[in-house]
Curated annotation (Swiss-Prot):
Superkingdom of this protein's organism: Bacteria
Lineage, opening ranks: Bacteria, Pseudomonadati, Campylobacterota, Epsilonproteobacteria, Campylobacterales
Record-given protein name: Uncharacterized lipoprotein Cj0983
Lipidation residue positions, type N-palmitoyl cysteine: 18
Signal peptide annotation: 1-17
Cross-referenced Pfam families: JLPA
Entry keywords, A to Z: Cell membrane, Lipoprotein, Membrane, Palmitate, Signal
Residues spanning the membrane: none
Annotated compartments: Cell membrane
Database matches in InterPro entries: JLPA
Species assigned in the record: Campylobacter jejuni subsp. jejuni serotype O:2 (strain ATCC 700819 / NCTC 11168)
Amino acid sequence: MKKGIFLSIGIAVLFSACGNSIDEKTVKKYENQLNQTVKQEIASLSQDSGIKIEFSDFKCNADGDFIACLSPNFKTLTKDNNDEYQELFQAKNIKIRSNEIYKGKANASISIKEYYNDLFKNQKSIQSNLVFEDFKLGEKVVSDINASLFQQDPKISSFINKLSSDSYTLSFDNSINKQENNYLDNLDIKFYNAKLNFNTNLNINLKEDLLNYLDSKGIKFNTQTLVMDKQAINELLNIANYEQASDFSNTIQKYIILNNFKIDSTLKTEGVFSSYIATAKENLQTLKAQSQNEEQALIFDKALAILNNITQNDDYKLNLDLKFKNIPVSDYSTQGIDSIEKLSINNQDATEALKIILPFIMFSMLMGGASF
């Protein structure tokens, strides 16, 4: 459900732009289109899922080369078994800031390639930022989380309850930079407060031919309404959803190259997991000693080294860096695990261990699916 809300607002950021000098008229036009798009997406989501969303209109203003917008008091609610609304989550403010501003002179629809060429005429990077301030789960959600853990240790139960009850900042930062024949797209997602800091990063290359493909599918940018052709987009997405082996899925993947995916996370545990971590380390030592072959020993040795590094003090730190080969996503079906160039976890090279263990994970998943 949350994914749908984030996607709704993200689409509004990605497919909204405005005029040349960011004057008051341009800002107002951007503001109106943003609110209209978000309301349409919320109405569709509410109709399909029965979720109630309390949303206040964005108010926008010029901020240098950017337009900054704010919407206060965001809430999502859903009905429980007693047909009463329960809060899923809320945010004190939603903030959007973007320099994706069309500065051309066209008065009609233009191709996607024309649109991006214009965007990069006077700026090296297109940046969009979406922030949920004081993001907090509803009381019923927190209660359900705690009930599902079946945790007997009162210290851990109290710790998890506080962690799930806290307020956080949730942010999405996306930047696109033009290179010779492609676009470098960098997405950062951050979820943090004083106790937990969880960051992910995805870095990809989009080939310029992707824009030509979208143009061939009739997707254009309307310079008057400041949005992409919604009907053409929906038609393209329908193909993606219902015809997985279609021209869309086969062609689009040829234009996308994953560079790397990262996770950087810190959790202040206050030492509540110490006894469990000690037991886990002892078990890994035992399994390593009892290994039947070198491959098993490698897996347990790497796991132990990584666990030691993550838990060397009460502030647990996880750093994961997954690098992919310089091949299009369309080649992954034939390359398989070899699509991965290197996996590092807390500066430990876990590539070979991953290649050994992943087939067993996939087999377990298939067997689990078969028994369903």
